[in-house]
């Protein structure tokens, strides 16, 4: 401590002084060196050692090393001593030493140097590192076909004193890559002995494509060692490379890979590779070295049977390979083993999932039996879905237990399945062959068959199937002792004579596994036996009652026991016995002439084996006056009959039946029912729907048979096929009486339940009556349920009316066809009389009432319908002032417009009586077509309407004196009142005075003559003639009408009111007189007589 302090103080002082001044650099370096040496020497004296390291590779020896102290040569070490250890000092010349492993705990170690220096330190196992020796690779080989590296090395476990766990790391390098492509850890156990290890690694890159190097290191894990455990150094690299010895450029070749996996394929080429593809899919190129490239294929699908092509294209060539992708074999499923003959064992299985690999790459199956050591191989070049494979192995003598292992193997892997069986419990026999049948008697036969196999140690169970026509199959089990390749015999009894049987056989072991297949069928007819029963017999008396007819049924096959050849019939009474000659089959009827005595009839059937027991029946029939007749309806082809129990019946009941339409005696069939029965169901294929059958129930007593009940029935009711025939018995004005006949039983086809009668009004062949439907409201329907009724009166009808009548019968089976008729009811005379009298009485009453009313109202009727016509002279409306009418141009109503007359007539003689003419207004062209053609067209005018003209000749003395005749033309002006009829004594009155109102103008014949006397005279004789101013008329106007027959100028003028109407323009102002219709027509015109209209 003093030395250390001494060296420390100058150093501090020096630093302190350096803070105040700057010393020189050499002095500073010298001080530091001296300080370091002092501290190191002081530490050696105190036993403090730095950088001491100890390692071990086998936990037996520790290898310790340390650096030499400063100023001490490594060769000056004298010894090293370990305290508390025998022989603790070791002579040394270097700074490292190997010492035996120390016990756990701290140990003091002293190192002495020749120069007197000494170093001490504490050593513990925790400070020691366990570093194994560098491992050595024994061999590195390669399987280029599978791209697999095979590595071998030795763990040198004998160098370690204790068993330990070792961890190995293997790294694989691919040239030219420097980083490992694989780094794998492996665990082993060091047992204290040298042990070799091997490891296989498959490269994704084919080994041919690059140089591969392998190096390993290891780590020992000994739990009791408390020091550091470190990895060893990596072993030197071991290389593997491919020496090209083929022309192949693409690797791997014909590789089998797992479907869905990834793989790398490379191409070694001296020229540039352009592309790489699998199938039609191009993949990117991976450059390895030089021109060598590779492609990665991801998720490879299952390939076709021919594989998937991989192609590399270079500048001058194309290279390729084939890849087969599939699956490893599935575990064999449903593995089962059995034997057919205890000589060979057959194992079958289902391959499971299809691998997708075929040919030499398909799955190979190996069946190995571990007890006997026998094996068999199965190899199939194709795979089929749901196919069953099988292999056969020979059985060893006296070996029952067999342990089978089935291994499935293909290039992608292998699986296996195992099974243990007892062969005697897995016996599935072969199909029995050579089945034969041999007679023993009519009810027993012997069956024999051959069965291959060695069954001496087991019992067999065989099933015999017995089948006959129209019967259920019968199966019988037979147990027998097994034999070797033997024929087996079995007796089959309880058979029916003369019956065809079909036999077949199958067998199994007594410890049942499964049945064999059925043998071929064998048909066989048993021999005949005597009939077991006599025929079922019945008897009927003939219609005349003199002969007895015997009926019998053919015996069933199970009772005939053979082919019936003939029948023997005999009848016996207390007085005599009769036997008929032999009746050959198939006749089943015989007739015997007997009297009224009681006979017992006997019938015997005979076949080649003998005769049957006789069947007997009594001929006597006990009368019964109390017989009821009932109705019955069946279902399908059967009918049920019932009756009350009769204690007097001592033997069977007999029910016979026949078609109702057949004549007596009729017999279709019969059955016998035990005497304790009260009903039975009769079933027969001869029953037909819609046919009536008679059923007769006979009771049997010791004296004979008695008829107890008669039943009529149908198996099924149908609708009648004909309509009832009906006629009209009587007709009246309000009713019709119809009558119909019964329908024959054969055509009724069921029990008659009633009639439906339709009627309505209607004529024949009208659409309304062609078919009657009850849905129409005007159709009347009567349902007649009393089937005994055969007439019907229809009341409340109308007389002399046609009715449509329809009649239909019906059963439970439906409605029959309809029969229609048209009937007309008679006329009702009382109604006709009433129909005549009522209108006559009404007419008389109406006439009387009308006459009374007309008489009382006659004045009103006259005024309304036929009033008096007033005198025009008294009409003030027509009394015009002359001064007003003359010379006034403003009065256009009285102005005469020119009008073309339709007729002009010139009177040459004055002796002709006055003539009044009312003609139609026509065109002059139509009146005189001959003359109009010569007339100037300019003078022609068409008049659509002009009032008719009344011409009247008036004798004028003044005119006569002047030497000419004058003509006056009148225009008929229609009066508003009906003219009154004139008496015959008034016809001689002056024509001028009776001409009525005739407005006119009289023109002188000579216009130059102005004789006022003549005018005044004319006014007096002609009456009232309103006229225009004569002086203002232009008689020579071209528009004036002129006569074409003479040179005289005769002009006609229109009405003083209008030239286009016959009505007055100024109506009468008398309020009591009727008013004219403004439309030019009045009710009075209807009663007016106009000549020539």
Swiss-Prot record:
It is a single-pass type I membrane protein. Residues 45-127, 331-428, 431-530, 534-625, 623-715, 720-829 form the Fibronectin type-III domain. Keywords: Cell membrane, Disulfide bond, Glycoprotein, Membrane, Phosphoprotein, Receptor, Repeat, Signal, Transmembrane, Transmembrane helix. Residues 908-941, 1003-1093 are annotated as: Disordered. GO terms for cellular component: external side of plasma membrane; receptor complex. Disulfide bonds join 54-64, 81-89, 209-266, 337-347, 462-507. The modification Phosphoserine is found at residues 923, 1040. It is found in: Cell membrane. It holds the Pfam family LIFR_D2. A motif (Box 1 motif) lies at residues 865-873. Glycans are attached at residues 165, 200, 239, 262, 386, 403, 422, 441, 454, 477, 568, 648, 659, 676, 725, 783. Residues 851-1093 are cytoplasmic. A motif (WSXWS motif) lies at residues 515-519. Residues 1028-1063, 1082-1093 have a biased composition (Polar residues). GO terms for biological process: animal organ regeneration; ciliary neurotrophic factor-mediated signaling pathway; cytokine-mediated signaling pathway; leukemia inhibitory factor signaling pathway; negative regulation of muscle cell apoptotic process; neuron projection morphogenesis; oncostatin-M-mediated signaling pathway; positive regulation of cell population proliferation. One of its GO terms (molecular function) is cytokine receptor activity. The chain crosses the membrane at residues 830-850. Residues 1-43 form the signal peptide. Belongs to the type I cytokine receptor family. Type 2 subfamily. The WSXWS motif appears to be necessary for proper protein folding and thereby efficient intracellular transport and cell-surface receptor binding. The box 1 motif is required for JAK interaction and/or activation. PANTHER family: CYTOKINE RECEPTOR, LEUKEMIA INHIBITORY FACTOR RECEPTOR. Signal-transducing molecule. May have a common pathway with IL6ST. The soluble form inhibits the biological activity of LIF by blocking its binding to receptors on target cells. Heterodimer composed of LIFR and IL6ST. The heterodimer formed by LIFR and IL6ST interacts with the complex formed by CNTF and CNTFR. This is Leukemia inhibitory factor receptor. The gene is Lifr.
């Amino acid at each position: 401590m003093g030395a250390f302090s001494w060296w420390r103080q100058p150093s501090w002082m020096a630093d302190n002084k350096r803070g105040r001044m700057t010393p020189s650099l050499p002095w500073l370096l010298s001080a530091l060196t001296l300080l370091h040496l002092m501290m190191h020497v002081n530490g050696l004296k105190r036993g403090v050692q730095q950088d001491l390291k100890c390692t071990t590779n086998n936990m037996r020896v520790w290898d310790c090393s340390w650096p030499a102290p400063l100023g001490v040569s490594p060769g000056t070490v004298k010894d090293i001593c370990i305290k508390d250890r025998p022989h603790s000092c070791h002579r040394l010349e270097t700074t490292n030493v190997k010492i035996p492993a120390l016990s756990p705990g701290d140990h003091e170690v002293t190192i002495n140097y020749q120069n007197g220096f000494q170093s001490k330190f504490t050593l513990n196992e925790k400070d020691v590192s366990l570093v194994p020796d560098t491992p050595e690779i024994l061999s590195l080989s390669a399987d280029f076909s599978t791209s697999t590296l095979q590595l071998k090395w030795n763990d040198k476990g004998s160098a370690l004193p204790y068993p330990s766990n070792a961890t190995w790391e293997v790294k694989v390098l691919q040239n030219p890559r420097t980083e490992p492509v694989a780094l794998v850890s492996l665990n082993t156990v060091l047992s204290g002995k040298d042990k070799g290890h091997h490891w296989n690694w498959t490269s994704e890159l084919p080994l041919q494509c690059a140089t591969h190097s392998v190096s390993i290191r290891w780590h020992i894990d000994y739990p009791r060692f408390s020091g550091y455990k470190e990895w060893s150094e990596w072993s030197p690299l071991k290389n593997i490379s491919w020496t090209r010895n083929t022309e192949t450029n693409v690797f791997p070749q014909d590789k089998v890979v797992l479907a869905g996996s990834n793989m790398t394929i490379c191409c070694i080429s001296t020229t540039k590779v352009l592309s790489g593809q699998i199938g039609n899919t191009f993949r990117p190129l991976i450059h390895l070295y030089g021109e060598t490239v590779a492609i990665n294929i991801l998720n490879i699908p299952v390939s076709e049977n021919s594989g998937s092509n991989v192609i590399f294209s270079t500048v001058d060539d194309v290279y390729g390979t084939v890849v087969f992708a599939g699956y490893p074999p599935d575990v064999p499923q449903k593995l089962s083993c059995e034997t057919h003959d205890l000589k060979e064992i057959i194992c079958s299985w289902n391959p499971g999932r299809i691998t997708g690999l075929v040919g030499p790459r398909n799955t190979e199956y190996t069946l190995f039996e571990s007890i006997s050591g026998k094996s068999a191989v199965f190899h199939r070049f194709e795979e089929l879905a749901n196919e069953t494979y099988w292999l056969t192995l020979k059985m060893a003598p006296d070996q029952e237990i067999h342990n089978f292992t089935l291994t499935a193997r293909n290039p992608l892997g292998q699986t296996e399945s195992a099974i243990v069986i007892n062969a005697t419990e897995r016996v599935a026999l072969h199909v029995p062959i050579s089945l034969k049948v041999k007679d023993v008697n009519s009810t027993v036969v012997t069956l024999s068959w051959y069965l291959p196999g060695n069954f001496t140690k087991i019992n067999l169970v065989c099933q015999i199937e017995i089948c006959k026509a129209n019967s259920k199959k019968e199966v019988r089990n037979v147990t027998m002792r097994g034999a070797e390749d033997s024929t087996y015999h079995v007796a089959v009894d309880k058979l029916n004579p003369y019956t065809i049987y079909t036999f077949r056989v199958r067998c199994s072991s007594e410890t049942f596994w499964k049945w064999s297949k059925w043998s071929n069928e064998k048909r066989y007819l048993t021999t005949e036996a005597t009939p077991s029963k006599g025929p079922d017999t019945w008897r009927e008396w003939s219609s005349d009652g003199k002969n007895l007819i015997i009926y019998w049924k053919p015996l069933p096959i199970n009772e005939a026991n053979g082919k019936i050849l003939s029948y023997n019939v005999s009848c016996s009474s207390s007085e005599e016995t009769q036997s008929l000659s032999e009746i050959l089959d198939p006749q089943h009827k015989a007739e015997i002439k007997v009297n009224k005595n009681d006979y017992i009839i006997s019938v015997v059937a005979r076949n080649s084996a003998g005769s049957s027991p006789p069947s007997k029946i009594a001929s006597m029939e006990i009368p019964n006056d109390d017989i009821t007749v009932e109705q019955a309806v069946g279902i399908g082809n059967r009918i049920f009959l019932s009756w009350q129990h009769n204690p007097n019946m001592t033997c069977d009941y007999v029910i016979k039946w026949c078609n109702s339409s057949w004549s007596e005696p009729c017999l279709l069939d019969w059955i016998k029912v035990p005497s304790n029965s009260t009903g039975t169901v009769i079933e027969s294929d001869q029953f037909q729907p819609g046919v009536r059958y008679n059923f007769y129930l006979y009771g049997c007593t010791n004296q004979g048979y008695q008829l107890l009940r008669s039943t009529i029935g149908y198996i099924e009711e149908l609708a009648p096929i004909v309509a009832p025939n009906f006629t009209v018995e009587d007709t009246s004005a309000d009713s019709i009486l119809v009558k119909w006949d019964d329908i024959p039983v054969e055509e009724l086809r069921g029990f008659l339940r009633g009639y439906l009668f339709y009627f309505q009004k209607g004529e024949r062949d009208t659409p309304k009556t062609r078919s009657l439907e009850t849905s129409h409201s005007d159709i009347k329907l009567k349902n007649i349920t009393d089937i005994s009724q055969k007439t019907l009166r229809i009341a409340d009808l109308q007389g002399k009316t046609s009715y449509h009548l329809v009649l239909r019968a019906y059963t439970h089976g439906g409605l029959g066809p309809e029969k229609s008729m048209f009937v007309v009811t008679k006329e009702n005379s009382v109604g006709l009389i009433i129909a005549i009298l009522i209108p006559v009485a009404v007419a008389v009453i109406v006439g009387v009432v009308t006459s009374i009313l007309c008489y009382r109202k006659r004045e009103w009727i006259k005024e309304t319908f036929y009033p008096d016509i007033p005198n025009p002279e008294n009409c003030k409306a027509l009394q015009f002032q002359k001064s007003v009418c003359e010379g006034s141009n403003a009065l256009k109503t009285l102005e005469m417009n020119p009008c073309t007359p339709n007729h002009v007539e010139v009177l040459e003689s004055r002796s002709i009586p006055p003539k009044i003419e009312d003609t139609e207004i026509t065109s002059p062209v139509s009146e005189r077509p001959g003359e109009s053609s010569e007339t100037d067209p300019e003078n022609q005018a068409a008049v659509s309407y002009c009032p008719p003209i009344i011409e009247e000749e008036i004798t004028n003395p003044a005119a006569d004196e002047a030497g000419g005749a004058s003509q006056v033309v009148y225009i008929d002006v229609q009066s508003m009142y009906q003219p009154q009829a004139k008496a015959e004594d008034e016809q001689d009155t002056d024509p001028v005075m009776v001409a009525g109102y005739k407005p006119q103008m009289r023109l002188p014949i000579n216009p130059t003559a102005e004789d006022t006397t003549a005018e005044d005279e004319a006014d007096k004789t002609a009456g009232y003639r309103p006229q225009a101013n004569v002086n203002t008329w232009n008689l020579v106007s071209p528009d004036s009408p002129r006569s074409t027959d003479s040179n005289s100028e005769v002009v006609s003028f229109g009405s003083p009111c209008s030239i286009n109407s016959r009505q007055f323009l100024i109506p009468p102002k008398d309020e009591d007189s009727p008013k004219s219709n403004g439309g030019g027509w009045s009710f009075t015109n209807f009663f007016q007589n106009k000549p020539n209209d």
